[in-house]
């Protein structure tokens, strides 16, 4: 009676070990100074400075001088002010900071942000929406996988009972 669940556990676990073996994590301790790693900075090609397609921020190319920890900084050094701003693009850090810094000037930018202002009575409430889509998607994937495993396990149990002759509908 207990053989079928153990068999399902072993077979199901073997199917999950193969994809998990391919996953790897890189810690800062694992990176050897002077050795090229697989980290790619978007917006740079052949050490030429190009504006980033997503955030309109200029990123520097790879430098020859190693830093103390052997890692290159992830903070960009140069930023450009954007005059051709597409409103259908998502909000970026540079565009919201730019709007806050130049709030003293007479011209203001109409920037799409994830902040919504709701006027209730005479009070103005500002709500900040976090990216909850990733969490909902992850929970949906986990629930879907668990349901699929249960469904397939039920089919295997029904087939095993039918083959043993103990199945009576």
Curated annotation (Swiss-Prot):
Cell compartments where the protein resides: Membrane; Cell projection, Filopodium membrane; Cell projection, Lamellipodium membrane; Cell projection, Microvillus membrane
Residue ranges, annotated region (Requires for interaction with MSN and EZR): 161-162
Alphabetical keyword list: Cell junction, Cell membrane, Cell projection, Cell shape, Developmental protein, Glycoprotein, Membrane, Sialic acid, Signal, Transmembrane, Transmembrane helix
One term under GO cellular component: plasma membrane
Annotated region (Requires for dimerization and lipid rafts association), positions in chain: 140-144
Signal sequence extent: 1-22
Glycan-bearing residues: 25, 38, 41, 44, 47, 50, 59, 63, 72, 76, 79, 83, 92, 96, 106-108, 113, 126-127
Extracellular membrane side: 23-138
Free-text description of this protein's post-translational modifications in UniProt: Extensively O-glycosylated. Contains sialic acid residues. O-glycosylation is necessary for platelet aggregation activity. Disialylated at Thr-59; sialic acid is critical for platelet-aggregating activity and for CLEC1B interaction.
Transmembrane segments: 139-159
Topological type in the membrane: Single-pass type I membrane protein
Keyword Transmembrane helix: yes
Span list, region Disordered: 37-69
UniProt-listed Pfam families: Podoplanin
Gene Ontology process terms (BP): actin-mediated cell contraction; cell adhesion; cell migration; lung development; lymph node development; lymphangiogenesis; lymphatic endothelial cell fate commitment; negative regulation of apoptotic process
UniProt topological domain (Cytoplasmic) ranges: 160-169
Subunit structure: Homodimer. Interacts with CLEC1B; the interaction is independent of CLEC1B glycosylation and activates CLEC1B; the interaction is dependent of sialic acid on O-glycans. Interacts with CD9; this interaction is homophilic and attenuates platelet aggregation and pulmonary metastasis induced by PDPN. Interacts with LGALS8; the interaction is glycosylation-dependent; may participate in connection of the lymphatic endothelium to the surrounding extracellular matrix. Interacts with HSPA9.
Record text about domains: The cytoplasmic domain controls FRC elongation but is dispensable for contraction. The cytoplasmic domain is essential for recruitment to invadopodia and ECM degradation.
Similarity-based family: Belongs to the podoplanin family.
Function (record text): Mediates effects on cell migration and adhesion through its different partners. During development plays a role in blood and lymphatic vessels separation by binding CLEC1B, triggering CLEC1B activation in platelets and leading to platelet activation and/or aggregation. Interaction with CD9, on the contrary, attenuates platelet aggregation and pulmonary metastasis induced by PDPN. Mediates effects on cell migration and adhesion through its different partners.
Protein name: Podoplanin
Species, as recorded: Canis lupus familiaris
